[in-house]
Amino acid sequence: MALLELVDFHYYYGNIHSVKGVNMYVDQGEMVTLIGSNGAGKTTTMQSISGLTKRRGIRGKIIFEGKEIQNYMGYKVANLGIAQSLEGRRIFSKLSVEENLKMGAYLRKDNIKADMDRVYERFPRLLERRTQMGGTLSGGEQQMLAMGRALMQRPKLLLLDEPSLGLAPLIVKEIFKAVNEINQEGTTVLFVEQNSKIALGTAHRGYVMQTGEIVMSDSCANLLTNEDVKKAYLGG
């Protein structure tokens, strides 16, 4: 049984049909990517999974651990073990690094320090800046903080929306090294990424989204050599 499954999933913004009949799944322990151009419906799909879109816009099913969650609000989805690092980071700019991380653990009180230590071990720069306000961090440090805050939730499923957005190539490499390690340590990962080459070079499987529809899915190894994918997304 898949950890996460979308079955004939649609999303409507009023009369605008933005996501159209998506069927996709993520198995326990997998790392899966959703690629596509801007406006394809990727972020709407991710935010619908995590309970951040208006529920009345949803048609179809979102299933997590065998339970339908398409009507769940965000706090209830988070309680199930789904955490999202949002596009554009969305950290608390007026809170310190440490306070931001504590916000990620607001649903519980146990072993917060141990989890924070693990985040600092993964992202040593956050330890160096733990008393610094989030808004004063560099873009790469803010992305590390956003991911660290999501990890403080101890998620079963980690959702990442455009983790490389606006970052220098060296920082992108560092971020995706961390994503790979997080997955290897047992956390299931689903991420949206416009840098298709990096996405397909990191994940196990990929889905290609165009104008709200999944038009292709395969192993990332196969997608990397697919001529249509190369022409549309890999500059080939």
For each of these PLM feature ranges, what is it?
Residues 2-236:
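Glycine-rich phosphate-binding loops of nucleotide-dependent enzymes
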